[in-house]
Swiss-Prot record:
The keyword Glycoprotein applies. Self-assembles to form functional amyloid fibrils called rodlets. Self-assembly into fibrillar rodlets occurs spontaneously at hydrophobic:hydrophilic interfaces and the rodlets further associate laterally to form amphipathic monolayers. Aerial growth, conidiation, and dispersal of filamentous fungi in the environment rely upon a capability of their secreting small amphipathic proteins called hydrophobins (HPBs) with low sequence identity. Class I can self-assemble into an outermost layer of rodlet bundles on aerial cell surfaces, conferring cellular hydrophobicity that supports fungal growth, development and dispersal; whereas Class II form highly ordered films at water-air interfaces through intermolecular interactions but contribute nothing to the rodlet structure. InterPro entries: Hydrophobin. The lineage of its organism: Eukaryota, Fungi, Dikarya, Basidiomycota, Agaricomycotina. One of its GO terms (cellular component) is fungal-type cell wall. It is found in: Secreted; Secreted, Cell wall. CDD domains: hydrophobin_I. Keywords: Cell wall, Disulfide bond, Glycoprotein, Secreted, Signal. It comes from the Eukaryota. This is Class I hydrophobin 7. Glycans are attached at N96. Residues 1-23 form the signal peptide.
């Protein structure tokens, strides 16, 4: 009688564990995608590395210390202005990383 109960419990545990294993996700989670809010789009006049002379000079004047980061010297894209509001340079998405509307750091290029 004890052997029969032990066999039933063992079978139940094996079945339960196999169901949990089958229900668990396989592989890594899908990567998250970056989202750009409309207000965070900017039109960059130039895109420069932080080690370039013009970018380093501007960063020095602003007191910003960066290493190995792309610095984007940008002017914002405006919604007002109709056809004249198109970006003819480098459109990017930036979030909370601008310094006095002169430069933005670590922006992501986007296509409009």
């Amino acid at each position: 009688m004890f052997a029969r109960q032990a066999t039933s419990v063992s079978a139940f545990l094996v079945l339960t564990l196999s169901l949990f294993a089958a229900a668990s996700p396989l592989g890594p989670a899908p990567p998250t995608t970056s989202q750009c809010n409309v207000g965070n789009q900017q039109c960059c006049n130039t895109v420069q590395d932080s080690s370039s002379a013009p970018a380093a000079a501007l960063l020095g004047l602003l007191g910003v210390v960066l290493q190995d980061v792309d610095v984007l010297v940008c002017s914002p894209i405006t919604v007002i202005g109709g056809l004249n509001s198109a970006c003819d340079a480098s459109p990017v998405c930036c979030e909370n990383n601008s310094f006095g509307s002169l430069i933005s750091v670590g922006c992501i290029p986007i296509s409009l």
